């Protein structure tokens, strides 16, 4: 059987000399892995993590790993490799997708979101965009945070906390008596115009990390690339 789609290469593992297993996050078919052969310098350039490719997958049976071929559509390598913030953000993004999405599970809407994020990242690193990516990823995996209004009073102003149980925002007055048990809602997530302080970056990292750990990273397993990214950002801001 054959699968044809457009996708982003998110992983590449050596199998034997000049032969690799790549994992591609495709628009209409989710994650697909296949064996590729690098027979030329051109093919080595094509099979790089982050490249957007036309993807062809072939196998006798659907459950087989299959053989893959790709044609390059766009490469982001040159944009990311010269900037550590961009590179670490990119590594974190593809690592999270690889960790949290199941093989051959469709995520077509999120694919479009990813392409838009990579395009923006290639132009400029923005911490707000990165955290919004993580929030979108949580929503895509079934754990959407409602940060638009207070989960108790439904007011949309003076939001200050997030409930770890309901994943909903809480106003300052509602949350104050329980503040030691709540997560802080970073102010920059409520306004696109606000400056982002170092403390707000820590708060944002803690916020999304809590829900990743509670619902998605089982047995204390975490995405190492995300840890590297966050450590870099928090130590260089």
From Swiss-Prot:
InterPro entries registered for this protein in UniProt: ARFGAP/RecO (IPR037278), DNA_rep/recomb_RecO_N (IPR022572), NA-bd_OB-fold (IPR012340), RecO (IPR003717), RecO_C (IPR042242)
A Pfam family matched in the record? RecO_N
GO terms of biological process kind: DNA recombination; double-strand break repair
What is the top-level taxon of the source organism? Bacteria
Q: Which Gene Ontology cellular component terms are annotated? A: bacterial nucleoid
What keywords appear on the UniProt entry? DNA damage, DNA recombination, DNA repair
Alphabetized SUPFAM superfamilies for the sequence: ArfGap/RecO-like zinc finger, Nucleic acid-binding proteins
Q: Which family does it belong to?
A: Belongs to the RecO family.
Matching entries from HAMAP family are given as: RecO
What function does this protein fulfil? Involved in DNA repair and RecF pathway recombination.
Q: What is this protein called?
A: DNA repair protein RecO
UniProt source species: Rickettsia felis (strain ATCC VR-1525 / URRWXCal2) (Rickettsia azadi)
């Amino acid at each position: 059987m054959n699968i044809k789609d457009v996708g982003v290469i998110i992983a590449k593992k050596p199998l034997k000399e000049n032969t690799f297993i790549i994992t591609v996050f495709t628009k209409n078919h989710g994650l697909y892995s296949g064996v590729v052969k690098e027979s030329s310098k051109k093919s080595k350039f094509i099979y790089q993590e982050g490249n957007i490719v036309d993807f062809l997958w072939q196998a006798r049976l659907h459950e087989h790993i299959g053989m893959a071929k790709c044609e390059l559509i766009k490469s982001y390598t040159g944009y990311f490799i010269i900037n550590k913030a961009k590179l670490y953000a990119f590594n974190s993004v593809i690592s999270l997708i690889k960790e949290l999405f199941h093989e051959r599970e469709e995520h077509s809407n999120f694919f479009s979101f990813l392409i838009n994020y990579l395009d923006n990242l290639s132009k400029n690193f923005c911490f707000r965009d990165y955290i919004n990516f993580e929030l979108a990823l949580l929503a895509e995996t079934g754990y959407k945070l409602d940060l638009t209004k207070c989960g108790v009073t439904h007011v949309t102003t003076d939001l200050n906390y997030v409930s770890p149980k309901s994943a909903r925002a809480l106003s300052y007055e509602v949350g104050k008596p329980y503040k030691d048990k709540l997560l802080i809602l970073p102010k920059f997530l409520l306004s696109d115009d606000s400056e982002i302080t170092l403390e707000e970056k820590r708060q944002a990292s803690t916020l999304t990390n809590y829900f990743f750990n509670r619902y998605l990273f089982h047995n204390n397993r975490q995405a190492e690339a995300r840890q590297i990214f966050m450590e870099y950002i928090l130590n260089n801001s």
